[in-house]
Curated annotation (Swiss-Prot):
Involved in stress response. Belongs to the universal stress protein A family. It comes from the Bacteria. Gene3D superfamilies: HUPs. This is Universal stress protein A homolog 1. Keywords: Cytoplasm. One of its GO terms (cellular component) is cytoplasm. It is found in: Cytoplasm. InterPro entries: Rossmann-like_a/b/a_fold, Universal_stress_UspA, UspA. The keyword Ribosomal protein does not apply. It comes from Coxiella burnetii (strain RSA 493 / Nine Mile phase I).
Length: 144
């Protein structure tokens, strides 16, 4: 299959470079456009457990700013321009799929490092994306 528009979904872990590099290889071999997305997923556990405590606006802005900076550094290595770099907030699978549909993506590249069941094979977020994606999904194994 020939891909025209690829989306790499990364978590900004140290192994995210492997995902971006693989996505860039596939994009280059298909002469495809490459976009990269990172989704900031706010966990209720991190902010007070079961109780809904509003996140500090300054903290949220700092997290987003640091995420954008890290994303820019990772994307620089494979020359992804800033207009093709996306930092979003929300539930990872929903935000990745929403962006993929908006951009008419035909391949989503995700990293995987899960630890049990299908999650071991794919990783929980990669598995979630695979089950709702309307395009091909390439799971890149990230070494522990």
């Amino acid at each position: 299959m020939h891909y025209k528009h690829i989306l790499a979904a990364i978590d900004l872990s140290p192994r995210s470079q492997e995902v971006i590099d693989r996505a860039a290889e596939v994009a280059a071999s298909n002469n495809a456009t490459l976009d990269v997305v990172h989704v900031i997923e706010h966990s209720p556990v991190a902010y007070g457990g079961e109780f809904s405590i509003p996140i500090n606006v300054n903290l949220e802005q700092t997290i987003e700013s640091e995420a954008r900076k890290a994303l820019t550094e990772l994307c620089h290595t494979v020359k992804v321009p800033s207009e093709r770099q996306h930092t979003l907030s929300g539930v990872v699978k929903h935000m990745v799929i929403e962006l993929a549909e908006k951009l008419n993506i035909d391949l989503i590249v995700v990293g995987t490092h899960g630890h049990h069941g299908l999650d071991k094979l794919l990783g929980s977020r990669a598995n979630a994306i695979l089950h709702v994606a309307t395009c091909d999904v390439l799971a890149v194994w990230m070494k522990e």
